[in-house]
UniProtKB/Swiss-Prot annotation:
PANTHER family: ATP SYNTHASE SUBUNIT A (PTHR11410:SF0). F-type ATPases have 2 components, CF(1) - the catalytic core - and CF(0) - the membrane proton channel. CF(1) has five subunits: alpha(3), beta(3), gamma(1), delta(1), epsilon(1). CF(0) has three main subunits: a(1), b(2) and c(9-12). The alpha and beta chains form an alternating ring which encloses part of the gamma chain. CF(1) is attached to CF(0) by a central stalk formed by the gamma and epsilon chains, while a peripheral stalk is formed by the delta and b chains. This is ATP synthase subunit a. The gene is atpB. Key component of the proton channel; it plays a direct role in the translocation of protons across the membrane. It is a multi-pass membrane protein. Keywords: ATP synthesis, Cell inner membrane, Cell membrane, CF(0), Hydrogen ion transport, Ion transport, Membrane, Transmembrane, Transmembrane helix, Transport. It comes from Rhizobium leguminosarum bv. trifolii (strain WSM2304). The keyword Membrane applies. Disulfide bonds: none annotated.
């Protein structure tokens, strides 16, 4: 195993594919994107395939996930926002599953790749723009004009709102990417301390106790972060969708 804490984020080809000079290779990132989607879909399918009045553990988790996202969407975008439930629920489950899979040794954390998180962010913002203009036409541009702003300040405020809107895919993607990247690097560093000190013999084993405790604590924290980052991504998605549904609501 490499001692480089960033080695775990390297993308490599599994099945090299090149068409017309364009690289379409199937990589470890491709594999774990497919695995994340398959695990999420598989869990929901098996959890709900034998539904009972008194739900089992897996059915309870599936139902809690459904209600959790449904309530989040209603609070963030109103009842009209429920039309976007499939999108928000799919994003939440995909990001959560990808984050959790990345916690296992030798597995690849796809949410530590900025291109992956940026693609998800573009999907969200693209949906906001398409639906906003489809539903409201050019009235969607009211999202850049907050109510109650004095006319003399309007040009400045509109400019700030436009810049803020354009920065959304960047902030949405970087937040998820940076948190997963930093957390996994920290885990790798402390785990490296444990291995290095343990290799020194009896004296080293004694010194490895503290890094080992820190590694265990950080691992627990990273599982929490895996959920929180999926939650934050879903919450922000609901907030952005609210702008598409109610462009003059702020």
């Amino acid at each position: 195993m490499s001692n480089d804490p960033t080695h775990q984020f390297q993308i490599f080809k599994i099945v090299p594919i090149e068409i017309g000079g364009i690289d379409f290779s199937f990589t470890n990132a491709s594999l774990f994107m497919a695995a994340s989607a398959a695990v999420a879909v598989g869990f929901l399918y098996f959890a709900t395939s034998n539904r009972a009045i008194v739900p089992g553990r897996s059915q309870s988790v599936a139902e809690m996930s459904y209600e959790f996202i449904a309530n989040m969407l209603k609070e963030g975008a109103g009842k009209q926002g429920m039309k976007f439930f499939p999108l928000v629920f799919s994003l939440f489950m995909f990001v959560l599953t990808a984050n959790l899979l990345g916690m296992f040794p030798y597995f690849f954390t796809i949410t530590s790749q900025i291109i992956v998180t940026f693609a998800l962010a573009i999907l969200v913002i693209g949906t906001v723009l398409v639906y906003g203009f489809y539903k409201h036409g050019f009235h969607f541009l009211n999202v850049f004009v907050p109510s109650g702003v004095p006319g003399i300040l309007l040009p400045l405020v509109v400019s700030i709102e436009i810049i803020s809107f354009l920065s959304r895919p960047i902030s949405l993607s970087v937040r998820l990417f940076a948190n997963m990247l930093a957390g996994h690097i920290t885990l790798k560093v402390f785990a490296g301390f444990v291995a290095s000190l343990g290799a020194l013999g009896a004296v080293g084993v004694g010194g490895a106790v503290l890094p080992l405790i820190m590694t265990v604590a950080l691992t627990g924290l990273e599982f929490l972060v895996a959920f929180l980052q999926a939650y934050v991504f879903a919450v922000l998605t609901c907030m952005y969708l609210n702008d598409a549904i109610h462009p003059g609501g702020h």
